[in-house]
Amino acid sequence: PADLSALSRRMSDRHFGIGADGIVVIMPSDHCDFRMRMFNADGTEAEMCGNASRCIGKYVYDKGLTSKTQLTLETLAGIKHLILDVKNGTVNRVSVDMGNPILFVPKIPVNTSLSEIISYPLEIENNTFNITCVSMGNPHTVIFLNEMERYDLHHIGALIEHHELFPKRTNVEFVEILSPDHLKMRVWERGTGETLACGTGACASLVAAVLNGKANRKAVLHLLGGNLDIEWNEKNDRVYMTGEAVTVFEGEWNNNI
């Protein structure tokens, strides 16, 4: 269908649709193996989605659309490189080169005269949170908390997502440092709300943790939906994400209903 935004809203609805954080469309590309478009549950289009890119890698290989185990994927955030870990004829894990983190404020973007936002105090309803802003092709605002269960993350996340600082809104990551190589993360996604995982958010969280002296350049991110291995390579400044990709179910959608 031409209106992918409306389709995403219908399919993502947990009462009248399938129920999802959004939809991912796999398309042909003129200069990559495949092209992806990602639409959030509210119908807005995202630049890319790290977790969706892993799902695409599994889908195209398992469905026989490619026999390659190294793929290029065209996204609105640039070309992403995927490495597929294949066992017994199916993809088990996928590693994605997520590219270089963007810290320059106009490129994120953030409404401020500062060039970078690292541990910047932001007041939200009489509470001050130190935020670090990173783009992984889409905007992220990372906040470090101790005992994050004490906070109403849905309320805070929504307020920050729509804060006047962020002209294109922002994803919000709440991170608790368990150790320098183990981080606990919850995410409030722009246009969707809290989700079980966010690949670009996990990458942004590790970058922010390193910038604030809280983590090593390689760490495990513990999310509600599972774990992701994230590395910010010091030599080439690129961030790499590795995680599982699992088929949950298959079905057909009647768009005439």
Predicted features and spans:
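Selected transmembrane alpha-helices and immediately adjacent juxtamembrane segments
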Residues: 131, 139-142
